[in-house]
Amino acid sequence: MPRAAVVCGLGSYLPEAVLSNDMLAAELDTSDAWISSRTGVRQRHIAGDLGSGDLALRAASAALASAGLERVDAVVLATSTGDFCCPATAPRVAARLGLVGALAFDLSAACTGFVYGLASVGSLISAGLADSALLVGVDTFSHTLDPADRSTRALFGDGAGAVVLRAGDAEEEGALLAFDLGSDGHQFDLLMTPAVSRAERSSGQASNYFRMDGKAVFGQAVTQMSDSVRRVLDRVGWQASDLHHLVPHQANTRILAAVADQLDLPVERVVSNIAEVGNTVAASIPLALAHGLRQGILRDGGNMVLTGFGAGLTWGSVALRWPKIVPTMD
């Protein structure tokens, strides 16, 4: 039987500093009612002086503890806000974990990064290049935002979520069963951060800040995630009605509701934690998984699809049966 990548550990980390809607309203022309009605976000965590590598280290340590492992063969970071333009952040995180010699690299696919990362790690394991691997979705997007832009500051937060995967077979719970991945670079400018380094992003120059076309992004996000979920369901032989859990990128509550409606899926099957953490970019899916486990929402052995959409434009989905996991949070 061909080797498969099997999820066996989960960890998460959120910075201690919390920025509530009321706190944001004290700085900008906005209100809790305005923010929550448009995005569903009530608070977000802010990294401050911490970098993405710092957050990734904490989530990775928690995931390794959850899996009962001290070492893995590969470390992959899905991030758009690495500590440097060059070198990649993953090798430094691996070294801080005591994993010198491990294969390590960064992957940049914005809010789809965690799904792309699962495909990359799954391929490494399936090819026999690794028997175990750590994937961290992490972003410190607050470092990219214009302090005067209420639309982006209201939406985005910082955080990290990580999973450990090991070699196994496709019959096991937690095995990655099927993927759908895609992109459309013609629309690259709908979401973008022109700056390439943290220093540039923190320079105070408006041209370096993250920007997005919210109205255009809404339509693309709903269409691409819905279509991607349908394709991956077809590849694994499931119907939408067979799904126990849909775990989408936490873009905003309106997008999540629209995707559920497109799939004719009861909204209670959609896992969401956006109210507590905001849009955490590549960290959003693993943070939503950790939330679902802690809340007792996720069903062991339940049919699950993870789906993402982000800058690029990129999108992707993966199907699996959720394994029994003890989550840990640093």
Swiss-Prot record:
Give the matching InterPro entries: ACP_syn_III_C, ACP_syn_III_N, FabH, Thiolase-like
Does the keyword Transferase belong to this entry?
yes
Q: Where is this region: ACP-binding?
A: 250-254
| Family annotation (Pfam families) | ACP_syn_III, ACP_syn_III_C
Under Gene Ontology molecular function, one entry of this record is: 3-oxoacyl-[acyl-carrier-protein] synthase activity
* Pathway where it operates: Lipid metabolism; fatty acid biosynthesis
GO biological-process terms attached to the record: fatty acid biosynthetic process; secondary metabolite biosynthetic process
Q: What's the superkingdom here?
A: Bacteria
| Keywords of the record | Acyltransferase, Cytoplasm, Fatty acid biosynthesis, Fatty acid metabolism, Lipid biosynthesis, Lipid metabolism, Multifunctional enzyme, Transferase
Q: Where does this protein chiefly localize?
A: cytoplasm
Enzyme category, top tier = transferase
- Identify the catalytic residues: C111, H249, N279
Catalytic activity, reaction form: malonyl-[ACP] + acetyl-CoA + H(+) = 3-oxobutanoyl-[ACP] + CO2 + CoA
GO cellular component term of the entry, any: cytoplasm
The places in or outside the cell where this protein is found are: Cytoplasm
Q: EC annotation? A: 2.3.1.180
User: Does the keyword Transcription belong to this entry?
Assistant: no
Q: Which HAMAP family match?
A: FabH
Supply the domain comment. Answer: The last Arg residue of the ACP-binding site is essential for the weak association between ACP/AcpP and FabH.
Q: How does it assemble?
A: Homodimer.
**What does the sequence similarity comment in the record state about its family?**
Belongs to the thiolase-like superfamily. FabH family.
**Function according to Swiss-Prot or TrEMBL:** Catalyzes the condensation reaction of fatty acid synthesis by the addition to an acyl acceptor of two carbons from malonyl-ACP. Catalyzes the first condensation reaction which initiates fatty acid synthesis and may therefore play a role in governing the total rate of fatty acid production. Possesses both acetoacetyl-ACP synthase and acetyl transacylase activities. Its substrate specificity determines the biosynthesis of branched-chain and/or straight-chain of fatty acids.
What PANTHER family does UniProt report for this protein, alphabetically? 3-OXOACYL-[ACYL-CARRIER-PROTEIN] SYNTHASE 3, BETA-KETOACYL-[ACYL-CARRIER-PROTEIN] SYNTHASE III
Name of protein:
Beta-ketoacyl-[acyl-carrier-protein] synthase III
Report the source organism: Pseudomonas aeruginosa (strain ATCC 15692 / DSM 22644 / CIP 104116 / JCM 14847 / LMG 12228 / 1C / PRS 101 / PAO1)
Gene this chain is encoded by: fabH
